[in-house]
Regions:
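Catalytic cores of secreted/periplasmic lytic hydrolases that degrade extracellular macromolecules
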Residues: 1-72, 82-209
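His-Asp-centered metal-binding catalytic motifs of divalent-metal-dependent phosphohydrolases/nucleases
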Residues: 77-81
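Conserved beta-strand/loop element in small beta-rich adapter and peptidoglycan-binding domains
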Residues: 208-219
Length: 219
């Protein structure tokens, strides 16, 4: 993202493992983050996003419902769809997180709006398929590309790219964290909120037979 710095100082207290790349993004959040801080970060990206579709208030609601760290939610939305401004995410009814946008059928993302998608992303992609850190997502994509991923025991991949997709998302989380520190701060420790997505309203009327992860044959 052109408008953001390439590196920032990492505060180990803000991550389960001491760093964003290995941070467990489900169930562990930095408390005290304010909607206005998230709005400020979104504005700082220079992306011309829809402020009614994604904003600090909604992001914190999605964190509460999905149990996914809000810093990770933003990072995913930025790299999947430039905050809803690119790809299938611009279609009516589709989501900005790439959920349901299978390589073979990207239009399937239209079955999940943003609120539904972030909860199902947590349930299916991150939890059921054991993709709780961005490092693990990268490691599994690499193993998948080289025929070494046992999906029966390790779960499916989140993405198939081996270009460091997870590391890019982790770096974005670090930028978000640093922006918060520079603009009022938040808790200097993590809070465990459990890892059971809880928003029944967000998950109603979901199609039960949607495949859990993207699946493509490596080239």
């Amino acid at each position: 993202i052109a408008n953001l710095p390439s590196t920032v100082e990492i505060n180990a207290n803000h991550w389960t493992s001491g760093d964003p790349y290995s941070h467990d993004i489900v169930g562990h959040i930095r408390g005290g983050i304010k909607p206005e801080q998230l709005d400020g970060f979104l504005d700082s990206t220079g992306i011309k996003y829809d402020k009614n579709r994604i904003n600090g208030k909604l992001l914190l609601e999605w964190q509460n419902a999905s149990k996914v760290d809000v810093r990770a939610i933003i990072a995913i939305a930025m790299w999947e769809s430039s905050l809803g401004t690119a790809g299938v995410a611009t279609s009516p009814g589709a989501n900005m997180f790439g959920f349901g946008a299978f390589d073979s059928n990207p239009d399937n993302a239209k079955n999940f709006n943003d609120a539904k998608a972030v909860v199902e992303l947590a349930k299916q992609t991150l939890l059921a398929n054991k993709n709780r850190t961005f490092k693990r997502q990268d490691d599994k994509a690499f193993a998948n590309a080289h025929g070494g991923l046992d999906t029966a025991t390790e779960g499916g991949v989140y993405f198939t790219s081996t270009s460091g997709t997870g590391k890019k998302r982790a770096n974005t989380m670090a930028l978000i964290d640093a922006y918060i520190d520079a603009n009022g701060g938040a808790d200097d420790h993590l809070t465990d909120i459990g890892d059971t997505p809880s928003d029944a309203k967000a998950t109603e009327s979901l199609t039960s037979n949607i495949p859990m992860v993207k699946a493509t044959v490596p080239t």
